[in-house]
Amino acid sequence: MLQLILHHPYASLAAGILLYFFCLATYRLYLSPVAGFPGPRLAALTRFYEYYYDGVKGGQFVWKVKDLHQKYGRLSCSTVVGQELKLEQGPIVRIGPCELHVNDPTFVSTLYPATGQRRNKDPFWTDQFGPKTAFGTVDHDHHRLRRGPFNRFFSKANVTRLEPMLRQQANKLCEKLEKYAGTGRVIDLSDPFGCMATDIISTYALGYSFNFLDAEDFQPNLLQGLNGFTPLAPTVKQFPWLLKLLRALPDSWALKINPKIAPFLDFQRTMKKVITDVEAEVQSEAGRPKADQATTIFHEVLRGDIPPEEKETARLWQEGEAIIGAGTFLQTPQEAV
């Protein structure tokens, strides 16, 4: 057998691959820093355990984690009730090769301390959002640099100043909804609220509104385009290089793969153009009084004292995509209105 491996390159390659996976499995099961925590062995061996429940069974991993706590959570002795010990479920289970799940709200302040601790992100979680965005930045200090220009725009005081615009958009939404009164038509409220959220955050971030509220029947809208990508999310999380491939594909090819993403592709094209327009505005405002200068998130980023590579167009349009996408797609803005 040894002679066969030494004299046949394919046999050597196969043996090397088998040895690699054997060593990897041994490390993950017995030598990893998290090897001592309870959990299914398959989850300890591969991240495809998570992918099976999220990608194949459709977003079920969060419920599987709950089951894992019930099955593998360590039991600990608590107080004596009469003659019996009260047993409590332990809060920590292993859900991946290098990942633990802690079912304890008090641990949040330890994991995300307010000050004094550096916390780098796991690329497995961030790569799916694109490495050029603040949200997708792994290094703690680099993330802080990218996040810095946005901080004041999301302070309580600055958000309070948005009230006139919020009222205007809310009145616009109500006027459109009143047109449907008595018609018997059914409106999925996620569409108008999604349109309103997109128009608000795009105006605040860019000084440009996508005017989705003006669309007939609130369609097409960005929320529909983002929903078209949702089924791909677990796969992109496992294989982040797919995100680069999807971005590189011609729009016509991408639409053949998934026609539902058409609104998102339109949004992406517009985002690139708007960022270019904002760059031109900032370059042309030299010498103008500060009171006459536009004050939006991306105008301030381009004026800010940050390295030139952080102001590149390719990075900024991805940042804009992330901010507006989050403001539209996340349930919080829609549920708030």
UniProtKB/Swiss-Prot annotation:
It is found in: Membrane. It is a single-pass membrane protein. It is an enzyme of class 1 (oxidoreductase). One of its GO terms (molecular function) is iron ion binding. SUPFAM superfamilies: Cytochrome P450. The keyword Protease does not apply. Its cofactor is heme. Glycans are attached at residue 158. The keyword Chloroplast does not apply. Cytochrome P450 monooxygenase; part of the gene cluster that mediates the biosynthesis of diterpenoid pyrones. The first step of the pathway is the synthesis of the alpha-pyrone moiety by the polyketide synthase dpmpA via condensation of one acetyl-CoA starter unit with 3 malonyl-CoA units and 2 methylations. The alpha-pyrone is then combined with geranylgeranyl pyrophosphate (GGPP) formed by the GGPP synthase dpmpD through the action of the prenyltransferase dpmpC to yield a linear alpha-pyrone diterpenoid. The gene is dpmpJ. It holds the Pfam family p450. GO terms for biological process: terpenoid biosynthetic process. Pathway: Secondary metabolite biosynthesis; terpenoid biosynthesis. This is Cytochrome P450 monooxygenase dpmpJ. InterPro entries: Cyt_P450, Cyt_P450_sf, Cytochrome_P450_monoxygenase. Diterpenoid pyrones display various biological activities and FDDP C shows anti-cancer and anti-HIV activities. FDDP C also shows inhibitory activity of 42-mer-amyloid beta aggregation that is involved in the pathogenesis of Alzheimer's disease. Its EC number is 1.-.-.-.
